[in-house]
């Protein structure tokens, strides 16, 4: 794909849900970052004339500083995004973000144990690099059906493969950015793909996939990414909204002009 003609149309939304008193999810699109609950999706359209990033971080529930950890994770990734050159640089940055969280914990003992799960999409030239740590998910739409690209770092995560139609997973996070009392290196999952016009990517926190199975998620998708994101969030709320809900949809296409 000629990156000079490549355009990303992105719709994104985060919501605290019906139960949580605060939103520990944070979403980012390059240098735009949001953690406050939203009433409707934002839509951003941009040329892929430089490295672009879409990311969701979910602060670990039951840990101190979940909201701080998710914002810090997104902010650090967003700051580094312009320097992404490929999967190796994404891996290095994620490992650095993990170390950064532990450095913050060491400097501020009251924040010990804070952490976040993360999923993101970095577009570098003609390639899309999908990355995740934890149980936030990334899908690609193929023929109208979603295929899982990320790998759950959770108990039962091995069962959540691309053929799993339940979309549901048990909890018990096996890996996160930060999240422990002392430093542990992180081993992010990376999938590198050649970007193609017409592709759609879906990023989401577990507040979506805990409420909706894959069939229900697919039923919410339309040609309009903003409407699709809104329908997904509303469906998760109607199903209970037990956790914070964050969704990003990325449509890739060529500029007709």
Regions flagged by a language model, labelled:
Residues 1-257:
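PP2C/PPM-type serine/threonine phosphatase catalytic domain
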């Amino acid at each position: 794909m000629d990156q000079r003609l490549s355009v990303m149309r992105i719709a994104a939304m985060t919501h605290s849900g019906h139960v949580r008193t605060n939103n520990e999810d944070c979403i980012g699109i390059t240098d735009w970052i949001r953690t406050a609950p939203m009433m409707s999706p934002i839509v951003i359209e941009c040329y892929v004339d430089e490295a672009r990033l879409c990311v969701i971080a979910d602060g670990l529930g039951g840990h101190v500083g979940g909201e701080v950890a998710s914002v810090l994770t997104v902010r650090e990734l967003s700051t580094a995004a312009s320097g992404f050159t490929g999967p190796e640089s994404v891996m290095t940055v994620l490992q650095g973000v993990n170390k950064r969280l532990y450095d913050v914990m060491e400097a501020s003992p009251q924040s010990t144990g804070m952490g976040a799960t993360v999923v993101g999409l970095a577009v570098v030239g003609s390639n899309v690099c999908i990355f995740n740590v934890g149980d936030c998910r990334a899908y690609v739409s193929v023929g109208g059906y979603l295929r899982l690209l990320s790998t759950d770092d959770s108990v039962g995560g091995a069962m959540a493969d691309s053929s799993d139609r339940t979309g549901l997973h048990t909890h018990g996070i096996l890996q996160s950015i930060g999240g422990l009392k002392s430093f542990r290196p992180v081993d992010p999952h990376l999938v590198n793909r050649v970007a193609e016009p017409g592709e759609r990517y879906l990023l989401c926190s577990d507040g979506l996939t805990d409420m909706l199975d894959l069939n229900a998620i697919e039923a919410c998708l339309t040609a309009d990414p903003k409407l699709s994101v809104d329908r997904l969030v509303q469906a998760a709320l109607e199903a209970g909204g037990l956790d914070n809900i964050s969704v990003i949809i990325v449509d890739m296409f060529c500029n007709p002009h």
